[in-house]
Amino acid sequence: MNNFIGIGKIVDSAENGRVLKFDLAIQQERPCFVPCILFDPTDEVKESVDQLQTKNRVVWLQGRVSMNEFEYQGRTIRKIQVVTYANGIRPI
């Protein structure tokens, strides 16, 4: 089963067409920034994410872990991110 649940603050959100990317800042001894992506977000979800980031609110986030692998300048690059579920972001 591939299930990610995290609690943190949304930072660095950016919309690019049908994709919303952001980081989930998880507070620990050293903050951990988890890259997240949300496909085809509704206007309501986009506005909600923007408000949660602006108000610096702590959120509960659920999604699945995804790894992309590609070649760049002869090197294999691996990128891990959380594909967030549309209803998987809730303020705490």
Map each language-model feature to its residues.
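Single-stranded nucleic acid-binding surfaces, predominantly the OB-fold ssDNA-binding core
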Residues: M1-I92
